[in-house]
């Protein structure tokens, strides 16, 4: 009878550190370890202490922090063929790291034994036994990673099984089946893992690489077959094409298979934030298409989809997005319908019927603007301004009569005339100078405009915009400290597109603030 709980070993700090173009500082590793402990993983593989001084330092530094659940594990290889376990540097570095858990990898593919290590099959079994037994004799919990297990099993089942049985006999607490080359398919993983589960009494684990795109699916199928320990990294970073993404594996195990893991379902709500922080640390922009936690994972663009989801969320969503700390989103675009527009209006407290001809007019105008280069799925606030105009709810709060930018090497000067008020401002670049000038003109009437900050600025160049050859699209993100919104401008000039997006962003804030304050519910 299989247990209902699945252990999680995170190897972001070890296998994830082997990702090309990624290098963790010691502070990065500590920060991630504390984040993983808060999430509720069972083991944190901190690194390979015999390979570099930074990992050695990590095992010393992490002792200064009190972890709530996770156990720190040190990684290493089985003993070298020419040394005894007692003399082996890798094994002794694990003991020296003063951790509770040692993760050992050893050979289970006969090809690696005879052609890489160039030793006999029996000699490799002795190496496995000696290494595991040595760590156990020092009081460590041992997780044995059977490297290249699935490939080895397919070529020599008897020897692969003998290798893991040897680790079990030596006292290994968990035996992990590794798809090191990442080439095994899900149905193979299921059949092979099930066979191992029937031959080995200790807990079976899984360590999958993503070279054929199946790391997550392979991990899930291994759990279905009876494995109760999974390994992976946050966001799937790792050697070559990466490891199994724990951000996907964990909710699949808990929400789809109904098994227990981490600290329970409350931990799942932290997945999006954990994913975001790790992306931030490695300097990679979050993948918006990432299952479960990506910004687009529960985003509905097609009008038919949006309409159905607004009636019954299960119609086009496999789970409630809030379970994993995410949110449902609707975007406005050329394939969107009235339901998408209504969603954003209802967020402002505006109730309208989707059959209202004014809504249909707004949708048509949005589609026409998209054909000219706009992309409102990236900047829905600009589309809301279009809808407010068609609904007759738009107020002329900002009337820019004139603007001009004089751009020198390190300084830009902007002159604007807003609502009859002429202002001049200096800034670092044209967008900054126009922003300052606009605020100077507006703050006398709308002092609340000073709450608004620019948080992101992006330019999409000509050739990247569909149906256009010469226009540029500028998207700007704003915040008032409580909510965020994006607007955009399209023009043949980067500066003009920026000014359009900037004016829209400030205008959106004032328009929506007026709507909320006046409690416009029906019109």
Curated annotation (Swiss-Prot):
Regulation: Inhibited by isoleucine.
Catalysed reactions listed for this entry: pyruvate + acetyl-CoA + H2O = (3R)-citramalate + CoA + H(+)
One GO term (biological process): L-leucine biosynthetic process
Pathway: Amino-acid biosynthesis; L-isoleucine biosynthesis; 2-oxobutanoate from pyruvate: step 1/3
Keywords, in A-Z order: Acyltransferase, Amino-acid biosynthesis, Branched-chain amino acid biosynthesis, Isoleucine biosynthesis, Transferase
Gene ablation phenotype (knockout): Cells lacking this gene show slow growth in MM, and the addition of isoleucine or citramalate restores the growth of the mutant.
Domain (Pyruvate carboxyltransferase): residue spans on this chain: 6-272
Gene3D superfamilies named in the record: 1.10.238.260, 3.30.160.270, Aldolase class I
InterPro entries: 2-isopropylmalate_synth_dimer (IPR013709), AIPM/Hcit_synth_CS (IPR002034), Aldolase_TIM (IPR013785), Citramal_synthase (IPR005675), LeuA/HCS_post-cat (IPR054691), LeuA_allosteric_dom_sf (IPR036230), PYR_CT (IPR000891)
EC identifiers of the protein: 2.3.3.21
GO molecular function per UniProt: (R)-citramalate synthase activity; 2-isopropylmalate synthase activity
Presence of the UniProt keyword Flavoprotein in the record: no
PANTHER family: (R)-CITRAMALATE SYNTHASE, ALPHA-IPM SYNTHASE/HOMOCITRATE SYNTHASE
Family: Belongs to the alpha-IPM synthase/homocitrate synthase family.
Task performed by this protein: Catalyzes the condensation of pyruvate and acetyl-coenzyme A to form (R)-citramalate. Makes part of a pathway for isoleucine biosynthesis, i.e. the citramalate-dependent pathway. Also displays a low alpha-isopropylmalate synthase activity, using 2-oxoisovalerate as substrate, but is unable to use 2-oxoglutarate.
Protein's name in the database: (R)-citramalate synthase
